[in-house]
């Protein structure tokens, strides 16, 4: 029992030290937010594999399966999108990297790219996420955007900020790109 408590505390401490992608909050209403994200460097895997398979490929990349054999720090959040044809997962790269300095992946399925600056809307929720919770919060997100007469661009996706080992105070989001004029 003592070991388990130590493991949970240590893991939580390690996870809380992850760099988190920066954004500006434009509008906040309870668990709903409109945000502006500047461009950022990301690594992406898109495949017909499960999310676990995509995570493994991205984790291998940041663990040294890259042109420099270097370990790249884990950051938050992790972006996930599932549709009928493929699952996509993206890791945000640490802000100290750019396209010229980031190690190149050895795995051809891992793509490095610079995202565009965009507006997003999200609904935040806690606990361990599952498809039922995600669908509930996605509907809440669409309802709020409809109330505000804000149009979406693309599909809603899932964003996770925590390791699966974190038990308390988990942070998840249903998020979508929006057409927004500030």
Language-model features: locations:
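A solvent-exposed interaction/effector surface
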Residues: 2-182
């Amino acid at each position: 029992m003592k070991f388990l408590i130590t493991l949970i505390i240590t893991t939580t401490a390690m996870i809380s030290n992850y760099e988190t992608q920066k954004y500006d909050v434009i509008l906040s209403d309870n668990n709903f937010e409109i945000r502006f994200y500047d461009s950022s460097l990301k690594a992406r895997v898109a495949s017909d594999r499960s999310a676990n398979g995509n995570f493994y490929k991205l984790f291998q990349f940041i663990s040294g399966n890259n042109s420099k054999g270097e370990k790249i720090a884990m950051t938050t959040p992790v972006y996930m999108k599932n549709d009928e044809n493929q699952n996509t997962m993206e890791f945000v790269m640490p802000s100290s990297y750019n396209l010229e300095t980031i190690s190149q992946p050895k795995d051809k399925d891992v793509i490095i790219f610079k995202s565009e600056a965009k507006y997003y809307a999200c609904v935040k929720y806690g606990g361990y996420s599952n498809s039922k919770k995600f669908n509930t919060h996605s509907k809440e997100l669409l309802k709020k955007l409809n109330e505000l007469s804000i149009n979406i661009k693309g599909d809603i996706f899932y964003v996770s900020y925590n390791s699966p080992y974190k038990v308390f105070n988990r942070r998840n989001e249903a998020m979508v790109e929006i057409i927004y004029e500030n």
